Swiss-Prot record:
It is found in: Cytoplasm. Belongs to the YneA family. PROSITE patterns: LYSM (PS51782). It comes from the Bacteria. One of its GO terms (biological process) is SOS response. SMART domains: LysM. Residues 38-89 form the LysM domain. HAMAP family: YneA (MF_02014). It comes from Bacillus subtilis (strain 168). Coiled coil: none annotated. This is Cell division suppressor protein YneA. NCBIfam families: PRK14125.1.
């Protein structure tokens, strides 16, 4: 069966539009997912390990799992962070002043 030129154009446009919608939905849902977590600003002298030490000691979380989660969710290519960088960490926001530890794995 040979498709007409109009049919080919329709299928092509439909595919492009559907792909765009799927990409937008996946981007929006991942952004909303991260909105439930605490965001911190990196200070002078901070490292991923020093931040992990602060959180892991008080929340009984494995430091390696913490660093892996932070690197993944913040799309870090290296462990280098700079003052002023904003990082999402695995502490879920409960409300303005209270937080609970998120599941890291």
């Amino acid at each position: 069966m040979i498709m007409s030129k109009e049919s080919i154009i329709f299928v092509g446009l439909f595919t492009v539009i559907l792909s765009a919608v799927i990409l937008m939905l996946s981007y929006t849902s991942s952004g909303q997912e991260l909105n439930q977590y605490v965001k911190i600003e990196v200070q002078q002298g901070d490292t991923l390990w020093s931040i992990a030490d602060q959180v892991a000691d008080t929340k009984k979380i494995n430091k390696n799992d913490f660093i892996e989660w932070v690197a993944d969710k913040n799309q870090l290519q290296t462990s280098d962070i700079q003052p002023g960088d904003e990082l999402v960490i695995p502490l879920k926001k409960k409300h303005q002043d209270a937080y609970e530890l998120a599941t890291v794995r």
